[in-house]
C-alpha cells in the first residue's frame, strides 16, 4: 500500500499554542502583573522653557530624583512641577512628605499651591503635608494610596528629603546605639520594588529630593576607580528606578542677576533681583544625559511664578531671529507680528532695550504663553 500524500496525513495534536498558553497564564496570574491595565501617560511642565525643552516637554509619570547642594533650587523646582501637575492632570492630588522640617511661609507663598494638614481638607488640586520622617510609615502610605485607588485619583509625591528619613528601628534607639548600616538604601530598594511599576503604569509621579555627600578616602592619593553616577544618598536602587535625575549645582556670585547687569553689585543702587539655576542632567529618557541646563529665577514673585519665563522667552526670540537687537532697540520682524495677529495678539514692534521688552512681556502674559508654546512645540522633540 502506497504512502499517503503529505496533505492527506493526519495532523498530530501538539497541544495548546504558545499564544494560548501565554493567554491562560496571564489570566491565572492577573493579580501579579499590569498587562491588562491601560498605561496612563502625560507630560507635566517643569515651569522653565529651557528645562521643558531639555526634557522633551516636561516630566512623565514615574520616579524622578532632584539632588544637589543646599539652596540649589531642588525644593522650589519640585513644587513648581507639583503646581503644574495639580493644574493640568485631571483628578489629581499631591502629597508632600516633610521629613526635614522645612516648609517656610515664603516657600508656600511662592509655590502657588494650597497646602493642607488634615485629611478632611485634602481635595483635588491641593497638597497634603505629611510631617513624618519614619521610612516605613512614609513607604506604607505611598504604597496604600497607589495600590488601593478605587477613586481613580492621580497622585504626585514629593519626598523632601530622603536624607531626613530614618528607619523605625533606629528611631527607638538611644544616641549612643549604632544605627543600621545602609538602612535607608535597603528600604529604598524595597519601596521601589513594591511601587515602581504601579507608579508609572497608573499615572502617578514621585520626586525624591536628596542631598549630596562627600566621599571619605583613606588614601587621598589613591586613584579613584569607583565610577559613580551621583553622590546622592538613598542607595543605587533609586538611581536605577528613576526616569530623570537632575543635579542642582551650587549658586555662586556670577549666577546672580542684578538690576544693572553690567555694573557692580550695590546693596542700594544695584540690587540682586534674581539668580540663574544650574542643572546637570545625570539621567534622562531622551539622550540628554550629562547636558547642562540653566534657567532664571526672579525674586519677590508669588503664586508659582518665580521662574522668569519672560527672560527665557526673550533669549529664544533673539536666538531664532524673531527679533533683532541693534543699538538701544529691540525690533520684532513683520512676519512674527503678523503671526501673532492671526491669534488676536497685538505685538508691539519696537522696544527700547531688553529690560523694557521684559517689562512689556510681564504685562502681556498671553504673548509670553504663545511664544512659550511655540518654542516647546518646535524644540521639545
Regions found by a protein language model. Name each.
Residues 54-57, 69, 81-89, 110-114, ...:
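Conserved, well-folded catalytic cores of nucleic-acid-processing
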Residues 18, 43, 47, 62, ...:
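Helical mechanochemical/support elements of P-loop NTPase systems and associated helical scaffolds
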Residues 3, 7-123, 143:
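The Walker A/P-loop phosphate-binding site
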